[in-house]
Amino acid sequence: MGLSDGEWQLVLNIWGKVETDLAGHGQEVLIRLFKNHPETLDKFDKFKHLKTEDEMKGSEDLKKHGNTVLTALGGILKKKGHHEAELKPLAQSHATKHKIPVKYLEFISDAIIQVLQSKHSGDFHADTEAAMKKALELFRNDIAAKYKELGFQG
């Protein structure tokens, strides 16, 4: 299920555009996640009080967390599938501390794709989208495997 060198290059090229504004992209990803799947907000005590999109857009904490999420994901993507060292602590915290189900990782993956389509439509062609979906699926599958090792049924 690995990606070819060409697919990784497509992923990293579009990710370079994300990195010009990690906080803005991250905030938009989280807003889409919470709008499309309001149940995910329950996992974020810090953001439960944010009820409207305007409140979410005005939240510096949400922007900061979006930056954290996409910084971590970028570090994983840059490893081109050789992300064991980066993935292990992430899986550990998401399984034991935050208790984030794999399903929610699917939801945020969808939100990432939507944000890329929206913000980078001129560069996010079908082949790039397919490569990014494949990279995110690889990430989710590897997280799910770590969850299983940790005994988390998420």
Swiss-Prot record:
Cited Gene3D superfamilies: 6.10.140.2100, 6.10.140.2110
Protein EC: 1.7.-.-, 1.11.1.-
Uppermost EC category: oxidoreductase
Phosphoserine: residues bearing it: 4
Gene Ontology process terms (BP): removal of superoxide radicals
Annotated Pfam families: Globin
Designated name of the protein: Myoglobin
The organism of origin for this protein: Vulpes chama (Cape fox)
